[in-house]
Design a protein with these regions (language model features):
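Extracellular glycan-targeting catalytic surfaces
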Residues: 1-135, 171, 175, 179, ...
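Short, well-structured alpha-helical interface segments that form or flank functional binding sites
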Residues: 24, 28-31, 44, 51, ...
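Contiguous N-terminal and early-domain "leader" segments and peripheral loops that mark the onset or edge
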Residues: 1-16, 138-152, 156-158
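Long, repeat-rich segments with strong aromatic
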Residues: 148, 152-234
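Short, contiguous, pocket-lining structural segments
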Residues: 82, 86, 90, 111-118, ...
């Protein structure tokens, strides 16, 4: 009955993951349905996507609260932790889908506004609550995952200030500090699953680069003074 002990790379087999599984399922559904809509232009794919968006972010009886106070709790020790914010990484796909669905007649204006308002509120929470502020500057993949989420949510809601911060963080911290001259990630290579964590890290960094790059500031082509760049990481 005592508090659980943290062991890197291991999870508690009795932990509650139903909500996380639901979020993963949502990201898969939105990604698939919105892709089908964009390829075919058929509303039969947009309509169910909108139903899921309404259930999660609009309807008072079913929508998720725009906060993560109880993420990655540890029995007997913590009711929630800052690193739990990484679990909403699956909402990146959802935010991207909501943006791409904007021209669908099925996604009426009032619903679009409600979805954007939800993501704006959650973005504000991860950028002001102590959990979010700690995760924002976390020195490994958690910090980059914060930025990927914030980038997707800011892109959907039009928050250029956040996007500018992430772009600067990518150029001043993620590449020159988290990546070495050979394209490796020292903090991830020290862990129990170095290969998997390294692949995850470059995947998340690629997502950040894709969202916040501009014609004038292409993070895919950016090279640090010490020679770190996305090409080496890939």
């Amino acid at each position: 009955e005592g508090p659980y002990i943290r062991r890197d790379g291991e999870t508690n087999p009795a932990n509650f993951i139903a909500h996380r599984k639901s979020m993963i399922r949502l990201s898969e559904l939105i990604g698939t349905l919105v892709s089908a809509y964009l390829l075919t232009g058929e509303e039969k794919y947009a309509r169910p996507a909108v139903r899921h968006l309404r259930a999660w972010f609009v309807e008072d009886d079913t929508k998720m609260r725009p906060s993560l106070l109880y993420g990655q709790a540890i029995k007997g020790k913590y009711t929630g932790r800052s690193i739990g914010i990484i679990d909403t990484l699956h909402l990146v796909e959802v935010a991207r889908g909501a943006k791409l669905l904007k021209d669908s007649p099925s996604f009426i204006t009032v619903d679009q506004q409600a979805v954007r308002a939800w993501f704006s509120e959650y973005l504000n929470w991860i950028n002001t609550h102590e959990y979010g502020l700690k995760e924002k500057v976390h020195p490994n993949n958690h910090g980059v995952c914060w930025s990927l989420q914030a980038a997707a949510f800011a892109d959907l809601t039009g928050n250029e200030e956040i996007i500018d911060w992430i772009r600067a963080q990518f150029k001043s911290v993620y590449l020159p500090v988290m990546m070495d001259e050979q394209g490796g990630f020292p903090a991830e290579l020290k862990r129990t699953k170095p290969y998997g964590y390294s692949l995850f890290m470059i995947d998340v960094m690629a997502g950040v680069a894709q969202i916040v790059s501009t014609k004038d500031e292409d993070l895919w082509q950016f090279v640090t003074p010490n020679g770190s760049e996305m090409k080496k990481g890939m």
